């Protein structure tokens, strides 16, 4: 059993190395040579505001931004009625006429990668694609190698590149000057978390590690004030599903692996077909919805899991976009916007 656990751990680490190597060598964002600002005082005038707090749109409003922070949002009139100048904030260094436009907080994408050498070797394409869709903050899981990610995070914060704000979540064992070797035991896990925290990461991207290793990583991350998110892949979900990880203090589940397994009626792992191959993503994605036969909607286990995850303040980040595309491949493949926006290498 000891050697079997070591084999599974090595297999898991080898898979991560392959995935990471695909992101090694990607080009960082070019120095910013376009755009305006920042300004000491920016005023956006006459917009219809969606504030993100659950209320309906309202406007017209004038929004004042000072020192890169919103300092006031002022209602300046009513739809179809001329705006009185005495209701408006003082002039800014720069002003945007937003009449007829909507203003809302930027989206936060909780699961991103910066691309790969094979598919999107230049991060400029990825950054601008996110921004064009209104994504102004991203959590890289990981964005790329540790040093690359921290450099891009700092350059974005300094407005040196055209990119969203970046939060850096990294895999255990990363770091060019990390001398502790592979993270295979609790003691090494804690040492690496302390090392990575000093480097400046924001959190850990975890896998379905064996319980003692997972516990050490999460516990030390909490002590270092780091966040945690996990892809609980099926290669390890029998020993670490969502409720197991949540009880250890995990903050977020990314993807959907491990969630259904936490509320199976009569199984511990999914009943795979005889020709199942985990490395075939069509097999993996195609089997997801088949778990409905193993779960009882609104049943006792369903309700108990829901209540416990809520009590633990646990976050679910299911990343269903690619799965949804896989369920209707022809619609996704023939979308009108591919010709203009999709990088040709994405089709290779």
Predicted regions and their residues:
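Bacterial N-terminal signal peptides
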Residues: 8-16
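Histidine-rich, glycine-flanked metal-binding segment
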Residues: 25-40, 49, 53-104
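Histidine-centered divalent metal-coordination motifs
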Residues: 46, 101, 108-115, 231, ...
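Metal-associated gating/positioning segment near the N- to mid-region
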Residues: 88-160, 179, 184, 240-245
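Divalent metal-dependent hydrolysis catalytic cores, especially in the metallo-beta-lactamase
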Residues: 126-147, 163-173, 197-209, 218, ...
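Active-site-adjacent beta->alpha loops and helix N-cap segments on the catalytic face
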Residues: 145-151, 208-220, 263-273
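Active-site gating/metal-coordination segments in enzymes
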Residues: 171-224, 251-252, 274-296
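Active-site neighborhoods of metal-dependent hydrolases
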Residues: 195-202, 251, 259-348
């Amino acid at each position: 059993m000891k050697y079997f656990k070591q084999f599974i751990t090595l297999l898991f680490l080898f898979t991560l190395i392959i995935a990471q190597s695909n992101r090694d060598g990607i080009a960082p964002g070019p120095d910013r040579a376009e755009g305006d600002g920042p300004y000491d005082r920016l005023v956006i005038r006459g917009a219809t505001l969606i504030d993100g707090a659950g209320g309906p749109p309202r406007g017209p409003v004038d929004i004042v931004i000072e020192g890169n922070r919103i300092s006031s949002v002022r209602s300046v009139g009513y739809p179809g009625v001329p705006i009185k100048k005495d209701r408006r904030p003082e002039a800014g260094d720069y002003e945007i006429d937003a009449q007829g436009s909507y203003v809302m907080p930027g989206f936060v994408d909780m699961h991103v990668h910066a691309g790969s050498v094979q598919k999107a070797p230049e991060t400029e394409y990825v950054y601008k694609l996110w921004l064009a869709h209104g994504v102004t903050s991203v959590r890289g899981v990981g964005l790329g190698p540790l040093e690359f990610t921290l450099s891009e995070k700092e350059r974005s914060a300094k407005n040196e590149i055209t990119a969203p704000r970046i939060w850096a979540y990294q895999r255990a064992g990363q770091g060019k000057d990390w001398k502790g070797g592979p993270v295979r035991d609790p003691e090494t896990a804690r040492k690496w978390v302390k090392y990575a925290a000093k480097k400046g990461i924001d959190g850990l991207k975890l896998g379905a590690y064996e319980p003692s290793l997972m516990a050490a990583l999460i516990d030390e991350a909490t002590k270092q004030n780091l966040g945690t998110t996990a892809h609980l892949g099926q290669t390890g979900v029998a020993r670490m599903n969502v409720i197991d990880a949540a009880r250890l203090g995990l903050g977020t589940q990314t993807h959907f692996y491990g969630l259904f397994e936490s509320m199976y009626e009569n199984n511990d792992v999914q009943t795979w077909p005889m020709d199942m191959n985990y490395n075939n993503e069509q097999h993996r994605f195609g089997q997801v919805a088949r778990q409905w036969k193993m779960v009882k909607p609104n049943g006792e286990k369903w309700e108990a899991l829901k209540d416990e995850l809520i009590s633990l303040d646990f976050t679910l980040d299911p990343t269903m976009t690619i799965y949804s595309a896989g369920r209707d491949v022809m619609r996704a493949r023939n979308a009108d916007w591919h010709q203009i926006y999709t990088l040709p290498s994405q089709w290779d």
